[in-house]
Every structure is written in C-alpha cells, then in structure tokens.
UniProtKB/Swiss-Prot annotation:
Protein name (record): Thiamine-phosphate synthase
SUPFAM superfamilies (UniProt xref): Thiamin phosphate synthase (SSF51391)
Keywords for the protein's UniProt record, in alphabetical order: Magnesium, Metal-binding, Thiamine biosynthesis, Transferase
Documented EC number(s): 2.5.1.3
Binding positions (2-[(2R,5Z)-2-carboxy-4-methylthiazol-5(2H)-ylidene]ethyl phosphate): 143-145, 175, 195-196
Residues engaged in binding 4-amino-2-methyl-5-(diphosphooxymethyl)pyrimidine: 44-48, 79, 117, 146
Top class in the EC scheme: transferase
UniProt remark on cofactor binding: Binds 1 Mg(2+) ion per subunit.
A single GO cellular-component term on record: cytoplasm
UniProt GO molecular function: magnesium ion binding; thiamine-phosphate diphosphorylase activity
Length: 219
C-alpha cells in the first residue's frame, strides 16, 4: 500500500474519536459501536492513564475495538505505542512530542498513517519533513481529559498554522464540543478530535451525528 495522500487523509479526519476503557462510564465496545453508527471517520485507541488496562487485557481490548472498526471500514489508530500498532497491524499510530520520534516511527511503520501532535510551527514543520501524514493541533480549548496538556491555543492558534503556510491535514484537539466544532473547522482544521464529547455522552450515536453535522456545515 502506498502512503496516504493529503486529500485522502483530510477525508478521514472530520470526526476523529479517541477513547480508552477508562474514558467511558458505559461499556466501551458499545460506545464505539454507537459512535461508528453515528458517523465517526477515524478512531484512535488511547489506553493510558489512571485505570487503563495493561498486558494481555490491553491487547485483547485493542483487538476487539479494531475488529469493530474493520466492520465499519473506519481506520484504527494506536496512540503512542508503535509496538502494539505493529503487533495488531493497525492502520496507523499517533505520537506526541514526548513519545518516540517521528523519524524512528516512520522507519518502523512503513507506509501506515502517522499523526503527530504539534504545538508550534517548528514542531509542525519538523513532523511534516520527517513523514507525518496529519497534525494534531491543540489544545484548542481547556480540557479535563488529559492532565499533562500544553497551554490552550484557541482557534487563533490553529489559524496561525494555516497563515504560516502549513497545508498538511490538521485535526483540532482539546476541549472540543458540539457547540464549538464549527469554530475549529472555520479556523482551518480538516476535522475535530474528541474524547468525552462522545465517550461520556448520554447517547454516543446522537453526539457523533451532531458533531458530523457541525463539521459538514463548516467545511
């Protein structure tokens, strides 16, 4: 399989759902199925933090989520763990600035999808030059899901990436809700990534559907 093109990547980013077992109050597999039914376009397993599964339980959980994504034809991305991504033959991996370096990740992952979190123009350019397929930019708004986040950038911070000539597909990250999705897309993002807006929603299906509507209205 050749590397994904910019146009193909940008079509996968509109509703990017990130979840681990510890992000849900309901059964995680049902939450993911409801989100898939509602229209998520890409999924990332982020099984880390307090209460996260480890060892074989983590691998088994990942396989179950991956199988669901395959059923719906939605790419399955692994957060941070390149070895797990390779073991599962996942569609790709997402790495932060404190995770394994992009050059090493690209060598290991071949032509799979690689996303990189970028907080500055310099980080973005380095990621692009060394093989990133998309950038996760944020946090756009304050978030309670991640405890180790950088300073909030706002939609102006996201727009700055575009103003500086960054044409790589971008997904906005951090504190995104149905209500502020349109502003993120209008600032230049190809999509929004959410955790709690879907994982803790009363109806993951309805929340996903509304997020997709907001993105599509603004693209």
């Amino acid at each position: 399989m050749p590397r994904i093109t910019k146009a193909e990547m940008s079509r996968l980013l509109p509703v990017y759902f990130i979840m681990g077992s510890n992000n849900c109050t309901k059964e995680p597999l049902q939450v993911l199925r409801d989100a898939l039914e509602g229209g998520i376009t890409i999924f990332q397993l982020r099984e880390k933090g307090e209460g996260a599964l480890t060892g074989e339980k983590r691998i088994d959980f990942a396989k179950e989520l991956q199988a669901l994504c395959k059923e719906y034809g939605v790419p399955f991305i692994v957060n941070d763990d390149v070895e797990l991504a390779l073991e599962l033959d996942a569609d790709g991996v997402h790495v932060g600035q404190d995770d394994e370096g992009i050059t090493s990740v690209r060598e290991k992952m071949g032509d799979k999808i690689i996303g990189v979190s970028a907080h500055t123009i310099e980080e973005a350019r380095f990621a692009i030059e060394n093989g990133a397929d998309y950038l996760g930019v944020g946090p756009i708004f304050p978030t309670s899901t991640k405890k180790d986040t950088k300073a909030v950038q706002g939609t102006k911070g996201l727009a700055h990436f575009r103003e500086q000539g960054i044409t790589m597909p971008i997904v906005g990250i951090g504190g995104i809700t149905i209500e502020n999705t349109a502003a993120v897309i209008e600032a230049g993002a190809d999509g929004v990534s959410v955790i709690s807006a879907i994982s803790l929603a009363e109806s993951a299906y309805e929340s996903t559907r509304k997020l997709a509507e907001e993105v599509n209205k603004s693209l």
